[in-house]
Amino acid sequence: MIPRPCRLCGGPLSPRPVIELKGMPKAAQHFPLETEFGVDQGIALTIRQCEGCALVQLDGEPVSYFKDVITAASLSEKSRSYRLAQMRDFAVKFQLTGKSVLDVGAAKGEMLEVLTEAGFGPTGLEASSESVAIGKSAGRNMAQGFIGEGVEVPGSPFEAFISLNYLEHLPEPGVAIRRISALTTPDAAGFVTVPNLEYLLATRCFYEFVADHLSYFTKKT
């Protein structure tokens, strides 16, 4: 089977896979019900590298819910403290205190409260209308829409943006990055977290290779 083109640059993927994993779950969310165990089957994950831009990626289609993937149910006390320290450092380093910030892939908007405490004026962008409704009911400044579809966000252009464990789920990360650029000022600063391929391989964290994750990044990519 001919590999699909690179989801970032459109170049050819390596004929030889970087990693092949068999018997893997079909998705990291929406697990089968007990009544479905008898017919549920694992899938093979084929990971290849682009011969052009070097991005390592899943050679396959995205899961059906990629627009509103949920990376965590909620922020634990420890996670919240960790993120708050990061956001405070981000604000100080780039002189962003009091500035507007867009959280891309905000889920229910829990990070907006962290961003507010860190001194930002935050807005959360989320594709799931259900998550947006929950966020708004908690008093959070939420906008509904998917970053890959040219959505307009009230309050743009923003002076900063964050995207936490979201870009790796998108079938066209380059489109999302260009759209983020269109929604932010020319000198905007960004804070992005994505899977670190070098770390995953060094620590043998193969559980991070799931159908939901379409891209695996290095410092170069």
Named regions from a protein language model:
Residues 37-41, 205, 214:
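Short Gly/Pro-enriched turn/cap motifs at secondary-structure boundaries
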Residues 88-204, 214-221:
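Conserved SAM-binding loop
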Residues 1, 85, 175:
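Short, conserved clusters of charged catalytic residues that mark active-site
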Residues 3, 44-47, 84, 129, ...:
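A generic "functional-site adjacency" signal
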Residues 1-78:
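N-terminal juxtadomain amphipathic helix
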Residues 208:
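Conserved histidines in hydrophobic membrane contexts and catalytic metal-binding motifs
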Residues 45-118, 123:
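Fe-S ferredoxin-like electron-transfer domains
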